[in-house]
UniProtKB/Swiss-Prot annotation:
UniProt organism field: Gallus gallus
MF-aspect GO terms: snoRNA binding
Matches recorded under PANTHER family: NUDIX T16 FAMILY MEMBER, TUDOR-INTERACTING REPAIR REGULATOR PROTEIN
UniProt keyword terms in alphabetical order: Cell junction, Cell membrane, Cytoplasm, Cytoskeleton, Lipoprotein, Membrane, Myristate, Nucleus, RNA-binding
Assigned protein family: Belongs to the Nudix hydrolase family. TIRR subfamily.
Domain of life: Eukaryota
A GO biological process held by the record: negative regulation of double-strand break repair via nonhomologous end joining
Gene Ontology CC annotation, any one: focal adhesion
Membrane topology listed for this record: Lipid-anchor
UniProt keyword Membrane, yes or no: yes
Protein known as: Tudor-interacting repair regulator protein
Database matches in InterPro entries: NUDIX_hydrolase-like_dom_sf, NudT16
Residues anchoring lipid (N-myristoyl glycine): 2
Amino acid sequence: MGVMAAVGALPAGAGSLPPLPTLGVPGVPELKPLTRYEAMRLGPGWSHSCHAMLYAPNPGMLFGRIPLRYAVLMQMRFDGLLGFPGGFVDRRYWSLEDGLNRVLGLGLGCVRLTEADYLCSHLTDGPHRVVAHLYARQLTLEELHTIEISAVHSRDHGLEVMGMVRVPLYTQKDRMGGLPNFLANSFVGTAKFQLLFALKILNMVPEEKLAEAVAATQKPKKPAIDHAAVAAAKQANELAAAARAGNEYADSGENQAAAHAAAELAEQQAAGLESQAVLEHLAAVPGAEAVVAELHAQPGADAVLEQPVAEAME
């Protein structure tokens, strides 16, 4: 069933109302807006969540040069997600504002909102039929600080609520510090959409600055340096260099051994030729047969005299 079918006919004159504002920030999925009247006429199959954005003008300067402009309160929840103070309201027993104030009393302790603080309603994505309502109230910076102090002493502090945080609305020169880095955190439900929507509708941050902050969070980040992997790669390179040096040294040693063997062979061949020449000379001298016989009679003499000659002849 569509929303309009669920809520029935609008009151007289409602058809001429201007269209509800949308977020219109690239990279952020739009949620369907509803008027408070439409939301209140949704059937019993719908759940209602109500949350509050408390903020105050802040004339402070970060580092003496970056204007803070506004202090906006959000909460770090028990599940590690960021969100606004508030929760689900059972419409069978409570009005939206009474149910919201009941939840705020548990998490903040000293603030009550009225229908005049109502800002917007949106249908949420997902399988559950939930309409999300956002209220916003501007306080003085002193009042906001009092709420921050009171929140520390509330019943839910340290249990469902880990603490209050202020949203940085500026962007530093590196284009990530401030709002972009904050938006890169994880938010519960529609909280991120509601934050951006409220900042735009209340003219707290220009729309183009919101778009730039969202776009900065969607750029691929450089991978972190794995120092262990770098050390392992360096060690592997050193081992590879040592192995190459060893192979070169082994090749050099083999070449030197081959050269030495060739030199010895040449010397042996030369010695064989000299031995052959000596034998031939002795054979030509009268009475030399006895000397030749004596040489052959010595142990290993045949190997010395004959083998080199045979190798030389080959």
